[in-house]
Curated annotation (Swiss-Prot):
It comes from Macaca fascicularis. Residues 257-275, 405-419 have a biased composition (Acidic residues). As part of the spliceosome, plays a role in pre-mRNA splicing. Probable inactive PPIase with no peptidyl-prolyl cis-trans isomerase activity. As a component of the minor spliceosome, involved in the splicing of U12-type introns in pre-mRNAs. One of its GO terms (molecular function) is peptidyl-prolyl cis-trans isomerase activity. This is Spliceosome-associated protein CWC27 homolog. Belongs to the cyclophilin-type PPIase family. Part of the activated spliceosome B/catalytic step 1 spliceosome, one of the forms of the spliceosome which has a well-formed active site but still cannot catalyze the branching reaction and is composed at least of 52 proteins, the U2, U5 and U6 snRNAs and the pre-mRNA. Recruited during early steps of activated spliceosome B maturation, it is probably one of the first proteins released from this complex as he matures to the spliceosome C complex. Component of the minor spliceosome, which splices U12-type introns.
Length: 473
């Protein structure tokens, strides 16, 4: 695959297509196909491709888009007419990820383009290759083909281009046009036909006369109430059930007997108009209403008591938690004190024993415990202490080296812990001597003396071997 990339010329220009399948980076061959690249870049700058769909998908072959109508037969170039094809000997349809112009014939290029999904040798010298998909965005390009298509190679749910962004424009003289897109004609608003009001035929009803009288009364009241807000007293002046005297509600906390008495007092004003049955009905209604109010008050009071109980319960739990914390802390402190007392008793008992080895062990233990207590905790003080110990060790080393002479280095004993400080590592130098060709010394030239007995013996042996070889032949 690398030999294919090497054969392709370098690119000059870059565009980013933001699609519903992901971003797609396109690098352009603006020197090899200048007209196609100029057309593509200017259409991207003019947002010509925004919200256009990929209307044609051939799996394993191409994905085509760039038609604002979405039919496959639309789209115009920036030149106002189709422009010529631009073929190049180093640009071939030999792999996926190539971007080329779609056309209906030779020299019929507009705004539509397509991506290749594989090798397509049959398209060579028929379509202008002007770009390639780069990087990992090639996988987003492949996702464009992962849709269901019909018999006409049109996807059921096509992907679309959301927007275009020109990252590098090799043409500095491009001036985007102001394209006036035709507005979609809104459908004519349907005229709502007012349905004529149907006339009510009361003669068909058994109680037609009464219903007709009620209808006339309602119409008369509605006509008189237009533009005004009135109470029920104003609306129903002739209603015997309503009194012109305002009713004063008794307190909600009164007993049921008081409510009945108040109802009797108020009903005395219109006994002339109301029958006994109607009076009982009114009493029942008022009693029900007041019962509802009292039940609501009881509920609210019960809820308040529940809230108070829950608050008091939570306070008790908090107090118990605080008390438990105090008890735990006290028990912990008591445990620490008991352990300290037991340790003191043990130390006193151990000191009382006269054994020398045990006494020495205790002294060493106390010594290390004292050192451990002197060590500070982690932090800046601990770091300072570590640096101080390091400097102390360095000074000790330099002092040991200065005290011991370089030439006379005595062998240290195993028990001498400080002998290693002044010890110097020495070993035999076994490195080979490298001969310099420019320097001539006694070892430069090889000396061969034929009179040397060793050389004589070697010559005789070699002659003997040669004779034996000849005899064998």
């Amino acid at each position: 695959m690398s030999n294919i990339y090497i054969q392709e010329p370098p690119t000059n220009g870059k565009v980013l297509l933001k699609t519903t399948a992901g971003d797609i980076d396109i690098e352009l061959w603006s020197k090899e196909a200048p007209k196609a690249c100029r057309n593509f870049i200017q259409l991207c700058l003019e947002a010509y491709y925004d919200n256009t769909i990929f209307h044609r998908v051939v799996p394993g072959f191409i994905v085509q888009g760039g038609d604002p109508t979405g039919t496959g037969s639309g789209g115009e170039s920036i030149y106002g007419a189709p422009f010529k094809d631009e073929f190049h000997s180093r640009l071939r349809f030999n792999r996926r990820g190539l971007v080329a112009m779609a056309n209906a014939g030779s020299h019929d290029n507009g705004s539509q383009f397509f991506f290749t999904l594989g090798r397509a040798d049959e398209l060579n010298n028929k379509h202008t290759i002007f770009g390639k998909v780069t990087g990992d965005t090639v996988y987003n390009m492949l996702r464009l083909s992962e849709v269901d298509i019909d018999d006409e190679e049109r996807p059921h749910n096509p992907h679309k281009i959301k927007s275009c962004e020109v990252l590098f424009n090799p043409f500095d003289d491009i001036i985007p046009r102001e394209i006036k897109r035709p507005k979609k004609e809104k459908p004519e608003e349907e005229v709502k036909k007012l349905k004529p009001k149907g006339t009510k035929n009361f003669s068909l009803l058994s109680f037609g006369e009464e219903a007709e009288e009620e209808e006339e009364e309602v119409n008369r009241v509605s006509q008189s109430m237009k533009g005004k807000s009135k109470s029920s007293h104003d609306l129903l002046k002739d209603d015997p059930h309503l009194s012109s005297v305002p009713v004063v509600e008794s307190e909600k906390g009164d007993a049921a007997g008081d409510l009945d008495d108040d109802g009797e007092d108020e009903s005395a004003e219109y006994d002339e108009y109301v029958d006994g049955d109607e009076k009982n009905l009114m009493r029942e209604r008022i009693a029900k209403k007041l019962k509802k109010d009292t039940s609501a008050n009881v509920k609210s009071a019960g809820e308040g008591e529940v809230e108070k109980k829950s608050v008091s319960r939570s306070e008790e739990l908090r107090k118990e938690a605080r008390q438990l914390k105090r008890e735990l802390l006290a028990a912990k402190q008591k445990k620490v004190e008991n352990e300290a007392k037991q340790a003191e008793k043990r130390s006193e008992e151990e000191e009382a024993t006269p054994d020398g080895a045990v006494a020495e062990y205790r002294r060493e233990k106390q010594k290390y415990e004292a050192l451990r207590k002197q060590q500070s905790k982690k932090g800046t003080s601990r770091e300072d202490q570590t640096l101080a110990l390091l400097n102390q060790f360095k000074s000790k080393l330099t002092q040991a080296i200065a005290e011991t002479p370089e030439n006379d280095i005595p062998e240290t004993e195993v028990e001498d812990d400080e002998g290693w400080m002044s010890h110097v590592l020495q070993f035999e130098d076994k490195s080979r001597k490298v001969k310099d060709a420019s320097m001539q010394d006694s070892d430069t030239f090889e000396i061969y003396d034929p009179r040397n007995p060793v050389n004589k013996r070697r010559r005789e042996e070699s002659k003997k071997l040669m004779r034996e070889k000849k005899e064998r032949r």
